[in-house]
Amino acid sequence: ITDKKVDINLHRRKMGMVFQHFNLFNNMTVIENIMMAPVYVRCKELKKAKRKGTLAPDAPKTKAEIKAQAREEALELLRRIGLEDKADVYPSTLSGGQKQRVAIVRALAMKPDVILFDEPTSALDPEMVGEVLDLMKELANEGMTMVVVTHEMGFAREVANRVLFMDQGKILEEAPPEEFFAHPKNERTKEFLSKVL
C-alpha cells in the first residue's frame, strides 16, 4: 500500500476503527453518530456519479434518499445489538458498554473489510466488558477480520487466529493462540503470561 500508484484512501474506506474512549460526538444523537460517515461518503459518490453520468438506476438520487437509507441501515445495526431504543438519545446518557457497542456499530455502518480495535474494553467498568467482548466474538464468528490490541487474554485465547505479543513497540512473539498460551518461547512473553493468567 506504500506504492504511489495505490490510492490509500480506497483502502481506508474499507477499514473501521474502534478506540478505547469511544470517540462518539457528544453533540449528535446515537443514530446521527452512526449515519454521519455513510451519508458523507455516499453524497460525495452521488455527486461524482452525477457529474460523470454513471449513476446506477437503483442508487439513491438525492441527499434525502441517502439519509433515509443510512438511517434504516443504522437502525438495523442498533436492533442487532439491542440498542434500537437508544437511537435518538445523546451519548452522555449511555453506559460505557453501550457507548462502545455504538462505536462498533458506527464502524460497521461503513461495511468495512477489517476493523481495528485499540483496547476496546480498557475504559469500561468490569461489568460492561462482557457485552462488548460478546459483540466482538459475534463479529469474529461471522468472519469479520479484526486486529485487536487487548489485555483480555481469555478473549484472545478464544477468538484469535494469531496472537502477537509486543513490548516497547517490538513484536517479541507471534503464534497461534494454542501455541502462544501453552508454549510461549520468549522469556518476556512467559513473564507476562505468568502475571496475567
Question: Positions of the model-derived regions?
Answer:
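ABC family nucleotide-binding domain
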Residues: I1-P177
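C-terminal boundary and immediately downstream tail of ABC-type ATPase nucleotide-binding domains
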Residues: E174, E178-L197
